[in-house]
Amino acid sequence: MPNPERHGGKKDGSGGASGTLQPSSGGGSSNSRERHRLGSKHKRHKSKHSKDMGLVTPEAAPLGTVIKPLVEYDDISSDSDTFSDDLAFKVDRRENDERRGTDRSDRLHKHRHHQHRRTRDLLKTKQTEKEKNLEASSKSGSTKDRISGSSKRSNEENDDHGKAQISKSSNKESRSSKLHKEKTRKERELKSGHKDRSKSHRKRETPKSYKTVDSPKRRSRSPHRKWSDSPKQDDSPSGASYGQDYDLSPPRSHTSSNYDSYKKSPGSTSRRQSISPPYKEPSAYQSSTRSPSPYSRRQRSVSPYSRRRSSSYERSGSYSGRSPSPYGRRRSSSPFLSKRSLSRSPLPSRKSMKSRSRSPAYSRHSSSHSKKKRSGSRSRHSSISPVRLPLNSSLGAELSRKKKERAAAAAAAKMDGKESKGSPIFLPKKENSSVEAKDSGLEPKKLPRGVKLEKSAPDTELVNVTHLNTEVKNSLDTGKVKLDENSEKHPVLKDTKVQGTKDSKPVALKEEIVTPKETETSEKETLPPLPTVTSPPPLPTTTPPPQTPPLPPLPPLPAIPQQPPLPPPQPTFSQVLSSSTSTLPPSVHPRTSTLSSQANSQPSVQVSVKTQVSVTAAIPHLKTSTLPPLPLPPLLLGDDDMDSPKETLPSKPVKKEKEQRPRHLLTDLPLPPELPGGDPSPPDSPEPKAITPPQQPYKKRPKICCPRYGERRQTESDWGKRCVDKFDIIGIIGEGTYGQVYKAKDKDTGELVALKKVRLDNEKEGFPITAIREIKILRQLIHRSVVNMKEIVTDKQDALDFKKDKGAFYLVFEYMDHDLMGLLESGLVHFSEDHIKSFMKQLMEGLDYCHKKNFLHRDIKCSNILLNNSGQIKLADFGLARLYNSEESRPYTNKVITLWYRPPELLLGEERYTPAIDVWSCGCILGELFTKKPIFQANLELAQLELISRLCGSPCPAVWPDVIKLPYFNTMKPKKQYRRRLREEFSFFFLPWGALDLLDHMLTLDPSKRCTAEQTLQSDFLKDVELSKMDPPDLPHWQDCHELWSKKRRRQRQSGVLVEEPPPPKASRKETISGTSAEPVKNSSPAPPQPAPGKVEPGAGDAIGLGDITQQLNQSELAVLLNLLQSQTDLSIPQMAQLLNIHSNPEMQQQLEALNQSISALTAATSQQQDSEPTAPEESLKEIAPAPAVQPSAEQTTPEASSTPADMQNMLAVLLSQLMKTQEPAGNLEENNSDKNSGPQGPRRTPTMPQEEAAGKQTGHESH
């Protein structure tokens, strides 16, 4: 609808107001000349426009060509960073553009009217003549524009308003035309009544708007403008938002190209021309604004944020833009808002795209957008450097003063020129309002340029809805302020476009209403005095209700409320306020009349509205720079407005809805400012809301992270939240690769836990990878046979930089009393077949669970299999575990698994191994449970492979086809070929057939033929095991048997030092005897007698005491001791005979070794107790009849007696002789039992020492 009107130059000429008609008549020749120039200069201007767009600052872009000088100033102050064009070059280009721009404006207007092409040829001569005049006037204006920026636009406006009078009152007309351009923007919005004038103005202004659009500075300042030039870009919210966000030369260049294309296309030029009439007003407005351009740019420096926001927000709807236009400026000051607006803008801008999608609207919008782009670009500049605002405002104040004077002269000239042009009432109003706006609104324009545009846009909406659309597009590109205006206008525009020119009045009213809200918001943000400043009391009266209620209720009144905001800025600019205030009442009345009579009073209303808007905008802008965060709420509103205006004509309600929606979006978004977003009533109290929202978002941000903590709490309660001081450390029970393991008690629950320390002081790369891997895997493994990690605690309450503080973390596990290695080495327990079945069943269930979860343990050994006193088995230490993918068959390191439990494929260099490696390790443990010793104990990989080959046969292709593929098959061959003897060897250990068969399958050389964990559970040995019916093993409750404890005892024994740990009395005695006896056993080589003497070195006093004790023992006590020895001794018949008949050192030592093996309690403190309490063993034996009690006493006696080889021999001889004499049958039984037990136990003890060494080496390999 608006497009055809815009395109119809005749319609515009005839239907336009008198002001517009006169310029068209007088400017017909000028338009034709401009067209001619456009034809010739379009190409030049494309390049120049691309340059000029970069050169022309946002001021020039929004305000018109007149703004270019200001743009120069602003470019230096705020836009220099964003726009790289030189100021001098910009000035020259601006001058050229102004000269050409006036011609272009006329040409473009005619192009838009489609008469442009036809009249080009006819008017070429006229245009050339008029162009000369215009050039002369534009030159003078451009010079003035350079000086004040107002004369430049006055020339452009002169061209737009009347080329005949342009030469006379180029300066006056430039100012009036600037005001007129702003009015024309309103007229565009009010296009229905103002179509003719706007079209003629467009023709005249098109060059200006074109210049502004093409001016490199404008483009550079407002990438949105560039985007706006291209309808797609303008429409695309992303494009606008991008432009706002990125004031980049590339967008500018693109814009320039778009502009050039528009210039080239007559249709596009005509559209832009139709848009340019609003530009005209902005041109005059810009000329006045030019003087305040520093302020406007400064405000824009704040507005840049608003601009960015407004770009997206305004695109969707200018409602939010207007009401928040001051806010938008303030928003512009807040970068968060601008970003948010961008994020939101895409949807609204897309909606605006719909209206823009109409090609005529697009082109017109693009040209009006170029104007708005100018203002938007200024706001962008502010967004680029909001800090520059104050500097610009101070400089701008001086410039505005000078420009005010120029504006006054230009306004007078404009009034005269415009009156002569044929719209004396409209133009004088424009001149008065524009002059006053310039005087009072120069600074305001700078700050509230977006607001002014909004206000002017409503008037233009009345004049031309299509212009509104173009303006909306332009405003989207221009800046957030303009975007806000456009967003408000744009919803109306869409509706009006659909409705038609008739609807333009309501649309204009709506837009005006939106603008009043924005004005109100800006006023509220600014200060209560602003409304007071508003000179027109009637307007405030009308204004207050619109301001208080949401946008919808204020359709007509908003225009008035805009006026009240105007006066408050006026006080800020006292000079400008005085002139604009006087003009404001008429302008307010004209605006009201505009609402009532759209066509006739639209021009005057536009002028007055522009003046009001400028004043109001100026006030918000000043406040905006003061309150950068406040703009955020309006942007939110703008977003809301953008969405709903597109959807529905009622811009005010839509704004609220959209504001709410943006809030949700903002809440979702990480941007803190948007979250609060003044959703409840941004128009009423935008400042507080704007301030509050940023706080809310910050509060909400931690909440965003809360779910993660919540997830942790769900799976693991408060991991990492507690400190290790919540536990009472009882003692060290183990040592890991990255720290110690402590037994501790939870102070809160009294529960026993194991704290695995993760040290960070030795880590070069932070948290140890093994700990990370273990934590990650254990959190995924929940099984009764897998150790449970309860939580993670820190060693410092504040948990600051642990790396710097050499702090540590602690993995909190459920406490297990023993590990299998400690139990087997302690000799305190003898596992029955049922116990072995239970242990293996639980172990294989846990391993099968891990394998089914695709995890390889890769470190199964006795020390990593934990037991509690109830006989429950748990698989622990997942530091080497990793996720296994059977499909990818990727290589893994083969330096895993302790050497004694390492399968042959790893020894031969296999890197693509399978879960079968864990099954081999479990097979080794099964054999160890029966033999009481590791079955493969070697210290080197080659030796380990040799031991495996002796028992399981040499690896060869016959039994293992793939072995030849392994890297070390040729280098690590056994010394000779061995046959498999596993069943034969283990048959001596009286293994059950089921266990032997299972062991044979688990220790198969070929991993592909090795049974799986699931198959082991189905074996005859384990399938019928019912754990619930199993009796718990008789484990030592008085002593926790862990690897560390057993290693300590072993080292002490090897060094000849008695165990120093003081266990309970019983435990200590047992440990003492077993310690002395076990030490010789471990150290003893094939010739046990030799090692024993060296190891047993108690004091002579002790030996004597023991001798006395043994003599004091009665036969009953000896019988008890004999019974104990019968059940747990490894003595053989020949040994007993030797002891009885021959008292040689070797035999005595052998007996001592046998006793040590049979008695399996070792304690570090036995030596102390032995010295201090030589008689204690005796008493304990007497008091305690059970075998365990007697056993400790015997153990203690043995170490005491073994002070020297002679003493030991004597003591043993006496003891054994007495025992044998008194109880020969018992001795026979003892010998028989020893025969049975000696086989398995003797071998187990022997490898203990190598086992430890190998373990140490293996650990080193694992760590690598």
From Swiss-Prot:
Pfam families: Pkinase
Region (Disordered), start-end ranges: 1-455, 471-611, 623-703, 1052-1103, 1163-1264
PROSITE patterns assigned: PROTEIN_KINASE_ATP, PROTEIN_KINASE_DOM, PROTEIN_KINASE_ST
Signal peptide extent: none
Crosslink position(s): Glycyl lysine isopeptide (Lys-Gly) (interchain with G-Cter in SUMO2): K263, K510, K655
One annotated GO biological process: mRNA processing
Domain of life: Eukaryota
Residue(s) carrying Phosphotyrosine: Y73
The keyword Transferase appears for this protein: yes
Catalysis performed (reactions): [DNA-directed RNA polymerase] + ATP = phospho-[DNA-directed RNA polymerase] + ADP + H(+); L-seryl-[protein] + ATP = O-phospho-L-seryl-[protein] + ADP + H(+); L-threonyl-[protein] + ATP = O-phospho-L-threonyl-[protein] + ADP + H(+)
Keyword Kinase appears in the UniProt entry: yes
Record-linked InterPro entries: CDK, Kinase-like_dom_sf, Prot_kinase_dom, Protein_kinase_ATP_BS, Ser/Thr_kinase_AS
Stored Gene3D superfamilies: Phosphorylase Kinase, domain 1 (3.30.200.20), Transferase(Phosphotransferase) domain 1 (1.10.510.10)
E.C. no: 2.7.11.22, 2.7.11.23
Biased segments, Low complexity type: 287-305, 313-350, 576-586, 601-611
Sorted UniProt keywords: ATP-binding, Isopeptide bond, Kinase, mRNA processing, mRNA splicing, Nucleotide-binding, Nucleus, Phosphoprotein, Serine/threonine-protein kinase, Transferase, Ubl conjugation
PANTHER family xref list: CELL DIVISION PROTEIN KINASE, CYCLIN-DEPENDENT KINASE 12
Subunit structure, interactors included: Interacts with CCNL1 and CCNL2.
Family recorded in the similarity comment: Belongs to the protein kinase superfamily. CMGC Ser/Thr protein kinase family. CDC2/CDKX subfamily.
Name of protein: Cyclin-dependent kinase 12
